[in-house]
Amino acid sequence: MPSFDVVCEANMVEVKNAVEQANKEISTRFDFKGSDARVEQKEGELTAFADDDFKLDQVKDVLINKMAKRNVDVRFLDYGKVEKISGDKVKQVITIKKGVTGDLAKKIVRMIKDSKIKVQGSIQGDAVRVSGTKRDDLQAVIAMLRKDANEAPLDFNNFRD
């Protein structure tokens, strides 16, 4: 019985490349001369550092621009609160979303059931498994989800025949 998984996870290699490119541009830009502006990457989160709120917004703009060029959807990013650190400097933690949330998974399963396509959707942890008897039905579900589910960047993997 053919099946596939609907997941929501960023390509971490491309995220790392985008962070490195953003840091390179920030270090060479004239308006950041003498500034301690940078973006650091840890497990599943990014931290943007800058001298003030205005420069922090510019750092985030550079990061978003580089992510868009690397084909990383910016809907993966979840911005935390801006925190003041030593002196006037500020930082902001940016979490990279991973996995399909419970509400989104329920909505995806509901969309699959309402579409009247002969497939079954089941929630399995942070993914939604879709299985059916025909490969064409699964491809129709993928097309329908790409068109209708816009809240999160969905990815389809683990396609089995």
Curated annotation (Swiss-Prot):
<keyword id="KW-0547">Nucleotide-binding</keyword>
<dbReference type="InterPro" id="IPR007551">
    <property type="entry name" value="DUF520"/>
</dbReference>
<dbReference type="InterPro" id="IPR035571">
    <property type="entry name" value="UPF0234-like_C"/>
</dbReference>
<dbReference type="GO" id="GO:0005829">
    <property type="term" value="C:cytosol"/>
</dbReference>
<comment type="function">
    <text>Nucleotide-binding protein.</text>
</comment>
<dbReference type="Pfam" id="PF04461">
    <property type="entry name" value="DUF520"/>
</dbReference>
<dbReference type="InterPro" id="IPR036183">
    <property type="entry name" value="YajQ-like_sf"/>
</dbReference>
<dbReference type="InterPro" id="IPR035570">
    <property type="entry name" value="UPF0234_N"/>
</dbReference>
<protein>
    <recommendedName>
        <fullName>Nucleotide-binding protein Rmet_2899</fullName>
    </recommendedName>
</protein>
<comment type="similarity">
    <text>Belongs to the YajQ family.</text>
</comment>
<dbReference type="GO" id="GO:0000166">
    <property type="term" value="F:nucleotide binding"/>
</dbReference>
